[in-house]
Amino acid sequence: MKNKQDILYIDPMVDFGFKKIFKESGKKHLIIRPLNAIFGLDIADIDIRESEQLGLTDQERKATFDMHCETKDGHSFIIEVQLADQTFFMERAIFYTSRTISHKAQSGDWNYDFKPVFFLGLLNFDIRHLEPEKANPDQFIHKFSLREDMTHEQMSRALRFAFLEVERFDKAKEECETFEDRFLWIMKNLPTFVEKPELWEDPYFDEFMEQAEFANMSWEEQERYIATMKQRWDFKNTIDFAEAKGEANRAVKTALKMLEKGFSPEDIAECTDPTEEQIKAL
């Protein structure tokens, strides 16, 4: 972990960094442009919604998103950043979008005509392929929708998914020709910079980096970020040490398994030794 004086830019792939850049900056175009590029849309504006979505009944569990936003005409976007591999992350994405669709249901007479829901996953691990033989090692953005199996005709435009393999992205800066590639490159490499790099002639990335600059944050924000990163590395080191010695900590294993099952960090913290903050850092 870097010393405070050595941090130039925050990591956009950790919870604090992602929300600082995309959610708290007030610069909604920083998330609008990636959504437009990845999903082929033409969004002009979005409203950032409450990240926690309660169940429709007392018995249903709540869903908490990293970011939830909507357009004026009701298109919904769920954005999730995931650092630790989860066996059922795809299923979790389906659960989140299904919950969002359920909340669009109207009382009284309703003909099931709801506005589209989009899910964007930013991953620090390799995507799991149900059909590995079809996987393209040079593909880092994976898009899914509802289609007919044989002809690939679209069944509906109401539900779409995109998963970005940030950690696996291995293109050099000079190889990044599209906005999507450049976005992936900056998301992965930003916290490694020791000096401001020469980037593409695009004001988007200038604003992105300005918002992510560690020196631009208040002292309180800097301390929160350092605490977040320390917890992340401490917990990672604990897991690495336990695995290397063949003595994996039972509480850590339990927490990871519960994350894979889709339990929230709050629920896991009540049942295991790791704190809620440590669990969120996974």
Regions found by a protein language model. Name each.
Residues 1-161, 170-172:
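Accessory alpha/beta interaction modules
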Residues 2-7, 16, 77-82, 174, ...:
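Short, charged alpha-helical interaction segments and adjacent helix-coil junctions
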Residues 25, 38, 123, 167, ...:
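Generic structural signal for hydrophobic core residues of well-folded globular domains
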Residues 148-157, 164, 178-187:
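Low-complexity, glycine/alanine/valine/leucine- and proline-rich hydrophobic stretches
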